[in-house]
Swiss-Prot record:
It comes from Xylella fastidiosa (strain 9a5c). NCBIfam families: glmM, PRK10887.1. GO terms for cellular component: cytosol. Belongs to the phosphohexose mutase family. Its EC number is 5.4.2.10. This is Phosphoglucosamine mutase. The lineage of its organism: Bacteria, Pseudomonadati, Pseudomonadota, Gammaproteobacteria, Lysobacterales. Mg(2+) binds at S104, D243, D245, D247. InterPro entries: A-D-PHexomutase_a/b/a-I (IPR005844), A-D-PHexomutase_a/b/a-I/II/III (IPR016055), A-D-PHexomutase_a/b/a-II (IPR005845), A-D-PHexomutase_a/b/a-III (IPR005846), A-D-PHexomutase_C (IPR005843), A-D-PHexomutase_C_sf (IPR036900), A-D-PHexomutase_CS (IPR016066), Alpha-D-phosphohexomutase_SF (IPR005841). SUPFAM superfamilies: Phosphoglucomutase, C-terminal domain, Phosphoglucomutase, first 3 domains. One of its GO terms (molecular function) is magnesium ion binding. Keywords: Isomerase, Magnesium, Metal-binding, Phosphoprotein. Activated by phosphorylation.
């Protein structure tokens, strides 16, 4: 496996103004991308740039633009748009690459850079390696007659709305359904309410007033308590929450109970199996609840686990010929409808199943019985990867695994996007699960 100097599991991410997430580095990053794309061609490459609603996005947009133009690449500025919208637009506008400035579900003082290929897919390892090598080379400014040009794309919202609506049948409607939509003050704030209203839903929209600083703050897919309370207070049929860049979706049922990515995978897999839409293997991750695997097995649906990260789920789907996969966090991949995880498109697929079958969300989940599972994040001041190598942590992990042997699973892993260690314990008994989790988390905290 290639060891990356700059790229993490989902692009480059960190605290604004520190390390790689600085204007000068992003300037060099844009220049490196432009040089890689220009290799072996006579015409200027074209790159789309989108962003979420963080205030630092303006700074990094300008830096990327300058670096690309200096390398001789044309740029189209999309503005605030969901990450999957940039993937779609990169493909449909025939761009050579797409770039998204976002830190997804992280707070406003983080930011990051994600890349898409010309086909709207995550970059492969070889392209990432070429960009990293170009970053280390001297900055290139081409002669003035070869500098890139910049323009702003005006019809991006309409294009993406039509793409999203095309992911469900022509006669699909949300009339008679009351929804609460939480857009996390993020990239879906102006698109998702418009789209769901066009489809006929009665809508209560929250998290739709971004100010550059409030993205993911107490709202969105990482703070479902806000959505749940609004669903109960408004008497809605269900709630839908996106994260800051719109590539994740979670839901709540009419009682405000959380419906996570494992739940949504079950709803889709069961219905698609019955309709003949399901192809190949359903792909989850090492963190997917064992109850999901059991429920799919009962239905005769093959299920495999990939490493944590939507790029690994995507890779496993391609290798197995599957079309459906995802993570409990809400990254869902419906590869017969979109090239990457798309919160809006995934939500529409779930709603289409519910409308077609005449079921509520809670009714659609009656065949799924999940094993008690809980995850805690322990802050780690240094490189989080070092935590799993510490002798006392490794010993505590062995003891935790022994405690649940035959009754559950234990996972300890460094986050690929945040300075935390994630600890997950799954067991058939909730008391055993909590005790095992507490003991292991205490050891990790003491070692931090």
């Amino acid at each position: 496996m290639r060891v990356s100097r700059y790229f993490g599991t989902d692009g480059i991410r960190g605290r604004v103004g520190q390390g790689l997430i600085s204007a000068d580095f992003v300037l060099r990053l844009g220049n490196a991308l432009g040089r890689v794309l220009a290799q072996g061609r006579d015409t200027r490459p074209m790159v789309l740039i989108g962003k979420d609603t963080r205030i630092s996005g303006y700074m990094f947009e300008s830096a990327l633009e300058a670096g690309l133009v200096a390398a001789g690449a044309d740029v189209q500025l999309i503005g605030p748009m969901p990450t999957p919208a940039i993937a779609f637009l990169t493909n449909t506008l025939r761009a050579d690459a797409g770039v998204v400035i976002s830190a997804s579900h992280n707070p406003h003082d983080d930011n990051g850079i994600k890349f898409f290929s010309a086909m709207g897919e995550k970059l492969d390892d070889a392209t990432e390696a070429a960009i990293e090598a170009a970053i280390e080379a001297p900055f290139l400014t081409v002669d003035s007659e070869y500098l890139g040009k910049v323009k702003r794309t005006r019809d991006a919202i309409g294009r993406y709305i039509e793409f999203s609506k095309a992911s469900v049948p022509r006669g699909f409607t949300l009339r008679g359904l009351k929804l609460v939509l939480d857009c996390a003050h993020g990239a879906t704030y102006h698109i998702a309410p418009m789209l769901f209203r066009e489809l006929g839903a009665e809508l209560v929209a929250i998290g739709v007033d971004p100010d550059g600083l409030n993205i993911n703050a107490g709202v969105g897919s990482t703070h479902l308590e806000t959505l749940a309370a609004t669903v109960r207070e408004s008497g809605a049929d269900l709630g839908i929450a996106f994260d800051g860049d719109g590539d994740r979706v979670l839901m709540t049922d009419a009682q405000g109970r959380t419906v996570d990515g494992d739940d949504l995978l079950y709803v889709l897999a069961r219905a698609w199996r019955a309709s003949g839409r399901l192809k190949g293997t359903v792909v989850g991750t090492l963190m997917s609840n064992y109850g999901l695997e059991q429920a799919l097995g009962t239905l005769g649906i093959p299920f495999i686990r990939a490493k944590v990260g939507d790029r690994y789920v995507h890779q496993a789907l391609v290798e197995s010929g599957g079309v459906l996969g995802g993570e409990a966090s809400g990254h869902l991949l419906c590869l017969d409808r979109a090239t990457t995880g798309d919160g809006i498109v995934s939500a529409l697929q779930v709603l289409e199943v519910l409308r077609h079958e005449g079921l509520t969300l809670s009714q659609a989940l009656l065949g799924l019985h999940k094993v008690p599972q809980k995850t805690v994040n322990v802050c780690w001041s240094g490189p989080a990867r070092a935590a799993v190598e510490m002798p006392e942590v490794r010993q505590a992990l062995v003891e935790a695994q022994a405690a649940v042997q035959g009754r559950g699973r234990v996972f300890l892993r460094p986050s690929g996007t945040e300075p935390v260690v994630r600890i997950t314990v799954e067991a058939d008994d909730v008391v055993l699960m909590q005790q095992t989790l507490d003991r292991l988390a205490d050891v990790v905290r003491d070692a931090a």
